[in-house]
Amino acid sequence: MPFEARDDNVDPDAIGNHYHDDGLLWQTHYAAVEVFDYPHATMHMKIFCQSYWGELHDLTFSYKRGSTKEPEEENAWETKFRQSLARPGTDEAAMMHTPLAAVVRYDTGNPTTHLFYISTGFKIREVIWKNGSQTNDCLGITVCPTSSLAVTKWGAGSQTHFRLYYQSKAGTIEEHCLDCNAGTWTKGATLSGPVSAYDDDSPLRGTSLSFINLAQDKPELRGYFQTAKGSIQEFTYKGTKWSTSKIGVDAAPFRTPLAAITVEKNKIAALYYVDAYNRINEVLWEGDWEGSERIDGESVAPGTRLAVASLKYIGHDKIHMFSSGLVNVITQRVWTRENGAWGDRPTIVDFEAPVQVEVEPGLDPAIHLTKPTRDGRRV
């Protein structure tokens, strides 16, 4: 029987300078995507997370050279841009500890980034960045308050297809579909039965979800979830119907985070989860599932979420993994194909919540710094 990950007596209210009203939300969810801007020959990565009062943040990191072909050293990443969205007290406000899922499409010639999150009314919202503009719309899909979110895609020519996954109020794993040219979301498949105390293979309420596609131009979909018994299982779809199978992880801490990705030209699938000792584990598929192994000896924060994104070049593969460190900072781990291993230690991604100054004319702004309130105002 799985059990909850131990917390090592960590008190989030005593974390230190990294835990404060303007800082990163303790146990925030993450989403990460790689973005290739071919018209401008630039390459960057976006990380999405949530801060203390519930605002969502978009952090953009870019290679110094801005090359789409030449990788730099790992610490050559530098903060390029940061913005806040889904502010508290607005119609776009996100629920606290909202799950996050993101995807990028290229069928318009320029990269278009889509971010999905859950509102305070437990409905899925979608933020789209396209050609320098941003929209935020409610999809009208009501989810379980503890639902996770996952998204994947495939495309051929000028048409891209999205598949969005979530958990319903009954606990079933549901799918919504978008053919991007059509522009309208439609209901897709129901992948599982409801949560059941009598079925060990039914989804755990609040299970993490992660989906990938093993093909670029057609659906060869795989999705991962945790069962009521605590095992991690796999959904598989190859264009006809969904099936469910085991991957060899029979017990993991309840609600362990799941993050999956493909490497080696989609020949290998990698799934990551956190064990009971707050270490990240990896399970690889290359025609068959291999045993679970820890990727390093470094602990993550209890209750952390995971996000992974890949940067792929000719002859190069990199996986960037993001999680929360023990002092409530964003940490990054990097795997490279050249080394065939993860780096020695995770590095810290700088997160500084924006400070706004609102003062009357003639007053010194240095002594009138403002801070956000729970309803989104600044006082």
UniProtKB/Swiss-Prot annotation:
The keyword Oxidoreductase does not apply. Disruption phenotype: Delays trap formation and weakens nematocidal activity. Does not affect mycelial growth, conidia production, conidial germination rates and adaption to environmental stresses. The keyword Aminoacyl-tRNA synthetase does not apply. Keywords: Virulence. Alpha-L-fucose 1 binds at E126, W185. Alpha-L-fucose 2 binds at R222, E234, W289. SUPFAM superfamilies: Fucose-specific lectin (SSF89372). Beta-L-fucose 2 binds at R163, W242. Beta-L-fucose 3 binds at E282. Beta-L-fucose 1 binds at E126, W185. Belongs to the fungal fucose-specific lectin family. Lectin that specifically binds to L-fucose. Is associated with the morphogenesis of the fungus, and plays a role in the formation of the constricting rings involved in nematode-trapping. This is Fucose-specific lectin g276. It comes from Arthrobotrys oligospora (strain ATCC 24927 / CBS 115.81 / DSM 1491).
